Amino acid sequence: MNKRKHMDIRRLIISLPAIMALWGGLASCDKMIYDNYDDCPRGVYVNFYSQTECAENPSYPAEVARLNVYAFDKDGILRSANVFEDVQLSAAKEWLIPLEKDGLYTIFAWGNIDDHYNIGEIKIGETTKQQVLMRLKQDGKWATNIDGTTLWYATSPVVELKNMEDGADQYIHTRANLREYTNRVTVSVDSLPHPENYEIKLASSNGSYRFDGTVAKADSTYYPGETKVVGDSTCRAFFTTLKLESGHENTLSVTHKPTGREIFRTDLVGAILSSQYAQNINLRCINDFDIRLVAHHCNCPDDTYVVVQIWINGWLIHSYEIEL
């Protein structure tokens, strides 16, 4: 009896290396197990980080909690679509994007797409990277309120899955830089005798995005932002917007409510870029804008006020001469 037990244990010990070798072969697509590599699972591991041109080191934003990740081939056709929940970015963490075939791929990723957005139809093997991925929800001309949320976008360098028959790796690794696609904009108007009579608005045609992070053509949409009186001669409004960039009608306006007359209207991004101090306000590095407009009484037909100075993040970017 004991002799048989010893024999069974010995057989088990002898067979363990064989079992481990078999498991390792299955896990790594060993040629000893597979006749070829056609059924071998493959893919790209992606590490996500965030770093602007102005930052010395990468960061790993804690507010990124969800990732929608897409892989497109060299022809711009979608080959893999994945959603990862409860994300926690770190230098060591990677996410696997499964792929079936050898070839060149680019990874596009969006962080924090939620129920504020409508997602377009997605079909593996048909959808192109130039198609619209999502649209910010809106009611008429007003966008849904995205205060307290952030949106992020990343793209990887082109990566290549090579033929494993030639000794290539089963999986490859890359990184993708998440850039924030939301802005927080505080606008104050000073030197108004009756600040309760004025309304601040901010609109942009940036509510739709393609898979590749570019803005799709859309009508201008107003972002919610209540104008409040914050002093004897000051009113203020706060807005959370999607990415403000040149060419998309980023219109900031101030209206005198009793008459309906606009006392100020400008393309916000255009005003920044046309300023001699534009180099101090790098739109690639800044997501928070503190805008101060200084008003002055003018010799106008309706005896009202106009804006004579524009300050952004402490910089006087424009001043205007008026007839007093």
Swiss-Prot record:
InterPro entries: FimB/Mfa2/Mfa3. It is found in: Cell outer membrane. GO terms for biological process: pilus assembly. The keyword Signal applies. Disulfide bonds: none annotated. Its main location: membrane. Keywords: Cell outer membrane, Lipoprotein, Membrane, Palmitate, Signal, Virulence. GO terms for cellular component: cell outer membrane. Residues 1-28 form the signal peptide. It is a lipid-anchor. Disruption phenotype: Minor fimbriae are longer than normal and are easily detached from the cell by mild shear stress. A lipid is attached at residue 29 (S-diacylglycerol cysteine). It comes from the Bacteria. The keyword Magnesium does not apply. A lipid is attached at residue 29 (N-palmitoyl cysteine). Palmitoylated. Palmitoylation is important for export to the outer membrane. Anchoring subunit of the minor fimbriae. Regulates fimbrial length. These filamentous pili are attached to the cell surface; they mediate biofilm formation, adhesion onto host cells and onto other bacteria that are part of the oral microbiome. Fimbriae of P.gingivalis are major virulence factors. The name (minor fimbrium subunit) does not indicate the abundance of the protein, but is derived from the greater length of the major fimbriae. In strain ATCC 33277 and strain ATCC BAA-1703 / FDC 381, major fimbriae are 300 - 1600 nM in length and about 5 nm in diameter. In contrast, minor fimbriae are only about 80 - 120 nm long. This length difference is observed only in a small number of strains, including strain ATCC 33277 and strain ATCC BAA-1703 / FDC 381, and is due to a loss of function mutation in FimB, a protein that restricts fimbrial length in other strains. Mfa2 is not part of the fimbrium itself, but anchors the fimbrium in the outer membrane via its interaction with Mfa1. Linear, head-to-tail oligomerization of fimbrial subunits mediates assembly of the fimbrium stalk, while the minor components Mfa3, Mfa4 and Mfa5 probably form the fimbrium tip. The anchoring subunit Mfa2 limits fimbrium length and is important for solid fimbrium attachment to the outer membrane. In its absence, the minor fimbriae become very long and are easily detached from the membrane. Belongs to the bacteroidetes fimbrillin superfamily. FimB/Mfa2 family. This is Minor fimbrium anchoring subunit Mfa2. It comes from Porphyromonas gingivalis (strain ATCC 33277 / DSM 20709 / CIP 103683 / JCM 12257 / NCTC 11834 / 2561).
